[in-house]
Amino acid sequence: MSIDIKYLSRIDIDREEFFFKDSRLMCKKFDEEREVLTLLEFDTKFRVNLLKKDKVYKYFLVSDANHKLLIANLVTEQQAKDLSFIEKDIMKIASSATAYGASDIHFIREDRICKIKFRVNGTMIDYREILSSEADALMFVLYNVMATTKETTWNRKLPQDANIILVINEKAYRFRYAHMPLFGEGGKNYHAVVRIIYPSNNFVCTNYQDIGYNEADTDAIARILNTSYGLFIVSGTTGSGKSTSLKKYIELLFFNKYKGKGCFVTVEDPVEYLISGAQQSSIVADNDDKTKNPFADAVRSAMRRDPDVIMIGEIRDKPTVEALSSAVESGHYCLTTIHAGSVVSVLQRLSGLGMKADKIASPGFLAGITSQKLIPELCPSCKVSFVDERYQRAVFSANENGCEACNHSGFKGRLLLLETLVPTVEDLELVASENWVSLYRKYRERRFIKTGKKGLGEGFSIKDKAYYNVLKGKVCHEYFMLHFGQLDHEDENIIYENYLQEV
């Protein structure tokens, strides 16, 4: 087999000047311009037998067509073990991350080294360090070769995103790639983060017992979902589990309320989890026409498909807000997510995105709001007890050395904290006047309402619920102090009284 391959040694690659020409990545060597599409490494056997070169180098720059031809030939000869070393290294990192249960993989490329870190149970842990040139090769192949959807060719100097699907232990994992250039020598540094989206475990939430919340939170969610129409907003920071919660809520509606007979449509960017009973659409932006808003167009299309329930993956801009408002006002039940830190700040964000306060305050428009956060849960096998001197409470901290049960981290899994708001007429009056401070005070007054339900209900903040779980021995006291800070004595007493009533 004769294959014309343009090749360079690793030293040449490191010294090479790469540039863009007509949206193509090019390199220049000895005044000859070449298009660069794929960086691969092959062992000696295949360099001699397949590439037919008298003089061979460790790395090759090959055209896309030649890359496909090479891979096809290797696969047909069942020599998968001889595929790109770089691809193998990527798979090793991804496999290790999933084995740890990591939510994200961080590549922090500095002038000489690149630090690889995993986020496990909300905490960053060191994985390993590699040479910066090795990191560049990893990112180049990950983006250009392994990504399924992406923008042109990898360019460290521009913010870029991509979606990747990798099969690990016979299961398909989705990865969301994003990088941003960092300050450094020669403009070569960057921070790349790969979010891991784990394969569906086929769990379907068909009743409120499956939701996994305490009685107070379950009651609030049931009241929000049982309205005939309106907007249900799930908020939280990045990585707070909003998509997982949306899946549960939609399945609850489909099986519990509609008895499996409704038309549920989703508009997502991209689809993250398979939702039983829903017709899911993944929206792809048109890179050639930045003026188009595919999200808003997809929402309008969804309204014409005879839906009972519409789910919009995320509120991002004014056109999406307007399209979503039209869907709610036309009598549909709609669910969506937004980035916000509390239920009251969600309303402020909607106002900032162009949704008028009088529209939000219209009776029936807003079904409810949740704000959520995932925090690490203490390992029950090795947590350490002590007395909090300020309040004289028995609390726990993470064991610095951990144990085998928690991979010596001191934490095992994550705990969902949920803040809920089911709006009353008084709340809506304050929303209409955009009196956010009074709305917050009104919301906090609900802490004193006795519901008879286990757990902290409406009126309690995420911080309150984190401390409640400190008292229950589920959350590390030091973690709480670091991420939430001190509670005043009045708030602490209210939470402690609720804790005593439950135990």
From Swiss-Prot:
It comes from Vibrio cholerae serotype O1 (strain ATCC 39315 / El Tor Inaba N16961). ATP binds at G236, T237, T238, G239, S240, G241, K242, S243. Gene3D superfamilies: 3.30.450.90, P-loop containing nucleotide triphosphate hydrolases (3.40.50.300). The keyword NAD does not apply. PROSITE patterns: T2SP_E. Pfam families: T2SSE (PF00437). Coiled coil: none annotated. InterPro entries: P-loop_NTPase, T2SS/T4SS_dom. This is Toxin coregulated pilus biosynthesis protein T. Involved in the translocation of the TcpA pilin. It is found in: Cytoplasm. It comes from the Bacteria. One of its GO terms (molecular function) is ATP hydrolysis activity. Keywords: ATP-binding, Cytoplasm, Nucleotide-binding, Protein transport, Transport. The keyword Protein transport applies. GO terms for cellular component: cytoplasm; plasma membrane. Belongs to the GSP E family. Its main location: cytoplasm. The gene is tcpT. CDD domains: PulE-GspE-like. GO terms for biological process: protein transport.
